[in-house]
Amino acid sequence: MGQSVLRAVFFLVLGLLGHSHGGFPNTISIGGLFMRNTVQEHSAFRFAVQLYNTNQNTTEKPFHLNYHVDHLDSSNSFSVTNAFCSQFSRGVYAIFGFYDQMSMNTLTSFCGALHTSFVTPSFPTDADVQFVIQMRPALKGAILSLLSYYKWEKFVYLYDTERGFSVLQAIMEAAVQNNWQVTARSVGNIKDVQEFRRIIEEMDRRQEKRYLIDCEVERINTILEQVVILGKHSRGYHYMLANLGFTDILLERVMHGGANITGFQIVNNENPMVQQFIQRWVRLDEREFPEAKNAPLKYTSALTHDAILVIAEAFRYLRRQRVDVSRRGSAGDCLANPAVPWSQGIDIERALKMVQVQGMTGNIQFDTYGRRTNYTIDVYEMKVSGSRKAGYWNEYERFVPFSDQQISNDSSSSENRTIVVTTILESPYVMYKKNHEQLEGNERYEGYCVDLAYEIAKHVRIKYKLSIVGDGKYGARDPETKIWNGMVGELVYGRADIAVAPLTITLVREEVIDFSKPFMSLGISIMIKKPQKSKPGVFSFLDPLAYEIWMCIVFAYIGVSVVLFLVSRFSPYEWHLEDNNEEPRDPQSPPDPPNEFGIFNSLWFSLGAFMQQGCDISPRSLSGRIVGGVWWFFTLIIISSYTANLAAFLTVERMVSPIESAEDLAKQTEIAYGTLDSGSTKEFFRRSKIAVYEKMWSYMKSAEPSVFTKTTADGVARVRKSKGKFAFLLESTMNEYIEQRKPCDTMKVGGNLDSKGYGVATPKGSALGNAVNLAVLKLNEQGLLDKLKNKWWYDKGECGSGGGDSKDKTSALSLSNVAGVFYILVGGLGLAMMVALIEFCYKSRAESKRMKLTKNTQNFKPAPATNTQNYATYREGYNVYGTESVKI
């Protein structure tokens, strides 16, 4: 009996504490259903309840809000059912939560059957369902208004399966009426980002430039990332983002490309309520409220906050109307068959639909089906200069553009801002000054491109800031990720406005950025270490004529001498007889020969004529003189030609290069060769279909260690240190410049492998492109480009025109040049001494024999001879017999 009394007293106290004001509860319990990716929304939900409960105004807070939260897995229908039933069994008055395509039907069915109101910021549905209060406004009307305003007649519609069917149906109906060409693609179930890329590439092949993207923020960011990677964010493209969180989307990488981006914004950041909420929001403890302090507020979080306002306002209305919504007893079983609805659920639903309140998302009202009505959506545009509010849309006025805030064009706006000019540290284009640490801004740099950027800025009338590219690369696209690096990446991803650098104009780059007319023409060339100058040989004086010619001269000399000898033998005019009337001769002197051109005299005559010297004898006969004349003519031409070439051969020390062309490189393996790791030169070999270059690319990509260098300086250093075992392939202009720099040990060999040019680059479709192009053309016509090249290449050269040696040194002869002449002189003198010694010995021996013969003759005196005999005359070893008898 006592226990029964105590139990009765306990329930009486609970009833007195829990109910007041005509049976209205002091605590309103609401449920919360959240998915995995709604972390910030969960924090906003709890913070909004906290803000309401800590409100000091009792008229605004006649009751206390309490919540019960469950997390559900939308892919598991049992999890969805269990989460809802868990909330219903707790006796909550209303449920706030999210749904997707898989869980929407389950949740709305339970709400309709059990008369439990479900307040959601998820995508709105066109179905006429009861007990569902949709916080998110429908975008269908705003999208159709903007399509008409922009006069889109051909576009691509990318939609999320969960939300896009109703909009797709409306667009297709409008397309039939307006003769639009619409390509619709569902992207809701795509998990691989490569599929987004394939869709964009396919649409680009169809010349599609306009896209309507109807997805959640995360998916839009993924699609735009692929758009940027593919370079489809340039001028001429227009993207309309059918999402209420335009400021939530990551647009920093897209905005500088030049494409027009239009979107919708439901949260007005200039609203005092929004500003006040954000001030408190950023001061929250991240551990208690995840994604609050260090993450921007999402529009779905703002809708979550407004949902708590709507729930609180609805129960205020019920309290003012003295509607008894108190729960008595158990809430019942949500799975009961038949379902047992809550009797007060209709009153709560009616109160929620009657709410009209100002929230963070503007005016909040609902129609009889729980859909937002009488709302205003801001329309934003994003261009190079930034984003701005382009107008607004509502159900009555439709789209209203702001005509008094027209966007200024990019070129005029660029005059009022500092243009970022990306470049690369590469001599002589951009270099640090010696005292750069004491300077600031653009004054720290010098070089060809520094001067060129200054001249272009002066003509275009812009302010600019030089920015050195972070990765030190020119720009190439990764074959796997398709992401651009280097200066091209700076332009593609909007981190720079202009690139003034030795950036080669190529097809793949032209697809994603714009180039001016070339400011410098060049080609790929080969750099090698300058070989050692070949020392002249001992007989280098023979080099002016080929050895074949020398052999022919020797044979000609012998032949002429023999012919002269024979001609002198046969011609009677070369013979002369002794005169009997001549005065008596010394019996000891030899007689004069009747023919002077014996074989030795013929050789001596030919040698004297060849050496341009005289001779004591000369031909008397006409035939002999003909031989001498043609020989003199022959020697005149030969000696003149020899003398003409002798100066060049003796004064120039030639260098023997191991290679002379790309073909020489390709067919050998001793000398390695490579290019920059990222740039047009590497791309040239990778894409080339010429057999020689294909062979070179096959070698380079498989060579170990790698033959690709990070910078040009690394490649040059490798050439200098490799002792002639590495050749570097680079632009001819850089090759020529380095050849003029100390230590003057590199050289360019062969011709250019291709023909191309350097250009000033701008983002695709940038308004600066045309102005920059005109500036480059003007500078070229004025001759300033040639003047700049001469200034930085040759006027500041350190090796001179001879590659490091002065003119005086190259024209002076060294002993090694003429050593052979001295050797011949010494050899000739030595030979003469030896021959003289032999002659002396021979003559001494002959004289000794003659003296002995004379003594013997004196001792023996024979009788005088009475007969006559022929007198024989000897001349230089040959017997010439006379025809007459001479008396002795």
Swiss-Prot record:
The species this protein was found in: Rattus norvegicus
Chain ranges inside the bilayer that never cross it: 597-612, 613-615
Keywords from the UniProt entry: Cell membrane, Disulfide bond, Glycoprotein, Ion channel, Ion transport, Ligand-gated ion channel, Lipoprotein, Membrane, Palmitate, Phosphoprotein, Postsynaptic cell membrane, Receptor, Signal, Synapse, Transmembrane, Transmembrane helix, Transport
Name of the protein this chain belongs to: Glutamate receptor 3
Residues spanning the signal sequence: 1-22
Superkingdom field: Eukaryota
Note: The postsynaptic actions of Glu are mediated by a variety of receptors that are named according to their selective agonists. This receptor binds AMPA (quisqualate) > glutamate > kainate.
Record Pfam families: ANF_receptor, Lig_chan, Lig_chan-Glu_bd
Modified residues (Phosphotyrosine): 871, 881
Lipid-anchored residues (S-palmitoyl cysteine): 615, 841
Single GO MF annotation: ligand-gated monoatomic ion channel activity involved in regulation of presynaptic membrane potential
Catalytic activity: Ca(2+)(in) = Ca(2+)(out)
Summary of the function given for this chain in its UniProt record: Ionotropic glutamate receptor that functions as a ligand-gated cation channel, gated by L-glutamate and glutamatergic agonists such as alpha-amino-3-hydroxy-5-methyl-4-isoxazolepropionic acid (AMPA), quisqualic acid, and kainic acid. L-glutamate acts as an excitatory neurotransmitter at many synapses in the central nervous system and plays an important role in fast excitatory synaptic transmission by inducing long-term potentiation.
Cytoplasmic-side segments: 568-596, 616-621, 839-888
Family, similarity comment: Belongs to the glutamate-gated ion channel (TC 1.A.10.1) family. GRIA3 subfamily.
Annotated transmembrane regions: 547-567, 622-642, 818-838
Extracellular side: 23-546, 643-817
